[in-house]
Amino acid sequence: MFTYEEEQRIQELCTMAFDYARKNDLQNLKIMIEAGLSANLKNHKGDSLLMLASYHNSYDCAKFLLENGANVDEKNDKGQTPLAGVCFKGYLPMCKLLVEYGANIDENNGLGMTPFTFAVMFGRTDVVEFLSQNSKKSFLKKISLFLLKIFKRNKN
């Protein structure tokens, strides 16, 4: 058991780690992970360090976390994966990184939404194109290419 003061200090350190992940402060996040903090640490909303790094486009921190065992498909309390957040935001390099580390392109959030769905909904055509090229589902490839043509036609 920890004392109240120890619990408070642990909470402060965890909050600092989440801030480092958001702000791409690799130097300080690295110190904490190397000192024993879990690369899969989650906050009160179920967001992992990787979720926050990915969502805030903190590429260096995301890569470091993945290299140190972060679960690439860890869902938050809303059922979202880091890849879903990245597809919503439209961060193609981050999307590529997560897929390189095995992110499931077709992961369902429990409401029928996938990372691909978010990319399509928010018009992230470069992300849609990348995901369609990397999906194992032939139907997804066909429909995504069709949707890409529509998006490109509507932009012109």
In which residue ranges do the predicted regions lie?
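Ankyrin-repeat-protein effector appendages
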Residues: 1-16, 101, 120-156
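Alpha-helical segment of the N-proximal tetratricopeptide repeat
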Residues: 12-31
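Ankyrin repeat A-helix N-terminal signature
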Residues: 19-24, 52-58, 85-91, 118-124
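Ankyrin repeat structural motif
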Residues: 25-33, 58-66, 91-99, 124-132
